[in-house]
Regions:
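Short, well-formed alpha-helical segments that are part of the catalytic scaffolds
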Residues: 24-39
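Short hydrophobic beta-strand elements that form part
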Residues: 18-22, 69
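A short, conserved beta-strand element in the Rossmann-like catalytic core
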Residues: 51, 75, 103
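Donor nucleotide-sugar binding loop of glycosyltransferases
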Residues: 26-29, 52, 105
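Short beta-strand-to-loop acidic/aromatic patch adjacent to the donor-nucleotide binding site
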Residues: 92-103
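Acceptor/aglycone-binding surface of glycosyltransferases and processive sugar-polymer synthases
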Residues: 70-89, 106-189, 216-228, 232-235
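A conserved acidic beta->alpha catalytic loop
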Residues: 49-57
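Hydrophobic helical membrane-anchoring modules
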Residues: 1-13, 159, 183-273
Length: 273
């Protein structure tokens, strides 16, 4: 038993795990989120503040987090772009997104990382629909229904069999993040689903683990109107992906950065787009 534990610790030492926190007005929950992280396996915590109006930045500094501050609210997707860029600059091997609003359980980070460490996955989702009934855990019924419907649509469009696409608890290999053309993605909530479309196009392996649902007053949550717009943007993305896959209308958004660089070098250009 001792040999196995030491072996696991050595394996973890070989992988630099960076947690990224896309933050917006997270002052009430940031401390508890950070406290629950398994710090023995996390090498660095990066928080990107997207123009918060509360004390998020001050608390992040007090906690000693690696802090990056946007000068205004650019959006959830823009926040993630900064998160992943800075994580890769920090030489991360594995990047885990943990929302600082405490809606996802930080103590499950070892389970999120395990499929990547074992080579079974390039991307891991924390699914709220794999475990207990999410509505009994506080998810509004209309969010549950829309989540199920959109997940059904995306599974058929992308050829996957996931229980949930709309989770903010995600882990990536550095190679996966580097291969996707993230700069072409939206700065809004649809960013997460664009990442899925890119991952499928590039043949990246996606798996999921069960995580509990947490809904409480301090947790951030999109309104009904925001969720409706989000749903429509997903349907547009699915159509765009279908046109790309069929060859009717190709999109650079779904091409790997390495492939685009090779193509443009052959064309006599010196930079990737």
């Amino acid at each position: 038993m001792q040999v196995n534990v030491q072996s696991e610790q050595r394996n973890r030492c070989e992988k630099k795990v960076v947690v990224v926190m896309p933050a917006y007005n997270a002052a009430r929950t940031l401390r508890m989120t950070y406290a629950d992280l398994p710090h023995d396996m996390v090498d660095l915590v990066i928080l990107v503040d997207d123009g918060s109006k509360d004390e998020t930045v001050r608390i992040a500094r007090e906690l000693g987090l690696e802090l990056f501050v946007h000068n205004r609210n650019y959006g959830y997707g823009a926040n993630q772009k900064t998160c992943y860029r800075e994580a890769l600059r920090a030489a991360a091997d594995i990047v885990v997104m943990v929302h600082p609003d405490y809606q996802y359980d930080p103590t499950l980070l070892p389970q999120m990382v395990a499929p990547i460490e074992s080579g079974q996955a390039d991307i891991v989702f924390g699914s709220r629909l794999l475990g207990a009934d999410p509505m009994k855990q506080g998810m509004p019924w209309w969010k549950y229904v829309s989540n199920r419907f959109l997940t059904w649509v995306e599974n058929r469009a992308f050829g996957l069999n996931l229980s949930e696409f709309h989770t903010g608890y995600r882990a990536y290999t550095a190679e996966a993040l580097q291969s996707m053309n993230l700069a072409t993605n939206s700065d809004k909530f649809i960013f997460d689903q664009e990442v899925v479309a890119q991952a499928v196009t590039l043949g990246l392996k996606i798996t999921e683990i069960a995580v509990p649902t947490r809904y409480f007053p301090q947790a951030s949550s999109a309104s009904f109107l925001q969720s409706s717009r989000y749903g429509l943007s997903i349907l547009y993305l699915v159509m765009k992906y279908g046109l790309h896959k069929s060859g009717i209308r190709r999109s650079r958004q779904f091409e790997s950065l390495s492939r685009r660089y090779r193509i443009e070098k052959r064309a006599g250009l010196s930079r990737a787009v």
